[in-house]
């Protein structure tokens, strides 16, 4: 049926993230089938209404944010949400977060659930969650920086070695357009740009505007 999936995650340069963000939002405004494949960034700042949600289990607050994109503009009937396990335990979720997420899912019992019911569930169980980091790259304009979407220490704002030649001719105020968050693992030995940003070596990280950053030899 000519369906072209849209990819949206945090490992794009700032300027490319803005383009992908707009493309996803605009696609859902059209009267055409659309498929968006996203990471946790879908929990924030995406003003869209989907008719099907397929998601890994997450913490309850995250699940409710994702469910908030389902049938946001009521289409005349309830829409389905499908959940599957996250086999990795650790960042960005602790084991207790995942267990609480499954507890939330089990309360649905294949029933029709409203946003009001989800909010009540959280209130009754008194689940305390840390607020997510401020989404600087969407709310603060491109002259700010890309803040982590989860707990501090999980990502670092960096530049890519493949961009350095181009970056060196820019004003410092323009550099954030080329920044992106990368995992803090394996950053030992990375050089710092004169602006203060770490530089991800090309032998470790490559980039394309359609797929984003990908780890060389990574999974």
Question: PLM features: residue spans?
Answer:
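Conserved phosphoryl-transfer motifs of two-component systems
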Residues: 52
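Conserved ATPase-coupling elements of RecA-like P-loop NTPase cores
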Residues: 46-49
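Conserved two-lobed SF2 helicase motor
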Residues: 27-43, 55
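C-terminal helicase lobe and adjacent C-terminal extensions/tails of nucleic-acid helicase motors
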Residues: 1-25, 55-60, 64-219
């Amino acid at each position: 049926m000519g369906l072209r999936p849209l990819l949206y995650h945090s490992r794009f340069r700032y300027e490319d993230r803005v383009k992908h963000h707009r493309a996803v939002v605009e696609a859902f405004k059209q009267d055409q089938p659309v498929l968006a494949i996203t990471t946790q960034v879908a929990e924030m700042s995406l003003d869209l209404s989907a008719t099907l949600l397929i998601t890994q289990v997450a913490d309850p607050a995250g699940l409710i944010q994702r469910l908030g994109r389902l049938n946001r503009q009521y289409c005349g009937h309830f829409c389905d949400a499908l959940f599957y396990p996250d086999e990795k335990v650790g960042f960005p979720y602790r084991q207790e977060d995942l267990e609480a997420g499954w507890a939330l899912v089990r309360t649905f019992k294949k029933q029709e659930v409203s946003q009001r019911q989800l909010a009540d569930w959280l209130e009754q169980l008194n689940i305390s969650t840390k607020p997510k980091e401020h989404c600087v790259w969407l709310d603060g304009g491109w002259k700010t920086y890309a803040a982590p979407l989860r707990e501090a220490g999980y990502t670092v704002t960096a530049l890519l070695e493949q961009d350095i030649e181009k970056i060196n001719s820019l004003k410092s105020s323009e550099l954030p357009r080329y920044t992106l968050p990368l995992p803090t693992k394996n950053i030992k030995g990375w050089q710092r740009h004169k602006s203060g940003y770490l530089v991800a070596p090309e032998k470790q990280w490559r980039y394309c505007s359609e797929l984003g950053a990908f780890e060389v030899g990574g999974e």
